[in-house]
Regions:
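Short, solvent-exposed loop/turn elements at beta->coil junctions and helix N-caps
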Residues: 77, 145-149, 176
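N-terminal glycine-rich flavin-associated loop
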Residues: 103-124, 150-153, 164
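A structural signal for short hydrophobic beta-strand segments in well-ordered beta-sheet cores
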Residues: 158-161
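Amphipathic, small/basic residue-rich leader segments at the start of a protein or domain
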Residues: 1-107, 124-128, 132-135, 139, ...
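Short acidic, glycine/serine/threonine-rich loops at helix termini
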Residues: 117-118, 152-156, 180-183, 187
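A short core secondary-structure module
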Residues: 167, 171-192
Length: 192
């Protein structure tokens, strides 16, 4: 069942002493159970082979999108699940048990790309891009690391300048971009 805005509402325990810190609401408990079943049935059987062959399972990733897992914190109007940070931690934990590489791809996509776009993107970018990344049609990434600066974002040397025709000229180099070359043909990802 894909996660949507119609997923049952959060019900908090009457006393904080009764709270299950790993599943603070019924919604979180349902999410954990759904992801745990998915990991057992789909992720675990392919994990070792994908890791040995250094292969990204795009079909499995897209299945995560159809389940509502690739835009957990994105608003429902853009195809996201509209959930919270605890939900992200639950999916992260369950995926990492069987396939840390897939988990890293999920986090790079869902948190570094989708979450940043939700909070920093223009309305037109959100409308154009979020539905495709939340569904898994597109795989998101973030080019942060640079040869001379590592991950020091305040020291970034790459620049982007808009041309008179509206296109962008990007100068600089990026490296170690998780999900950076994942598309149907294995070609480099487009820049936003």
């Amino acid at each position: 069942m894909p996660l949507t805005a119609t997923t049952p509402t959060r019900v908090m325990p009457e006393s904080w002493r009764d709270m299950d810190i790993a599943n603070p609401t019924e919604e979180h408990s349902m999410l954990r159970e759904m992801v745990r079943d998915f990991v057992r049935e789909k992720v675990e059987p392919q994990a070792l082979e994908s890791d040995r062959n250094e292969r990204f399972n795009l079909g499995l990733f897209r299945e995560m999108g159809s389940m509502g897992l690739l835009g957990l914190t994105a608003p429902p109007e853009y195809g996201g699940a509209g959930m919270d940070a605890t939900s992200v931690a639950i999916v992260n934990e369950e995926l990492s048990y069987s396939d840390p590489g897939l988990c890293l791809a999920f986090l790079a996509h869902d948190q570094l790309f989708v979450n940043n776009l939700v909070h920093s993107g223009s309305d037109s970018q959100k409308e154009r891009i979020l539905p495709k990344v939340c569904s898994g049609e597109w795989v998101g990434c973030l080019g942060m690391s640079e040869p001379n600066q590592g991950t020091d974002v305040l020291g970034m040397e790459t620049s982007a300048k808009q041309s008179d025709d509206g296109s962008w000229i990007i100068n600089g180099r990026k490296m170690w971009i998780t999900n950076g070359i994942i598309d149907d043909e294995g070609t480099p990802a487009d820049l936003v």
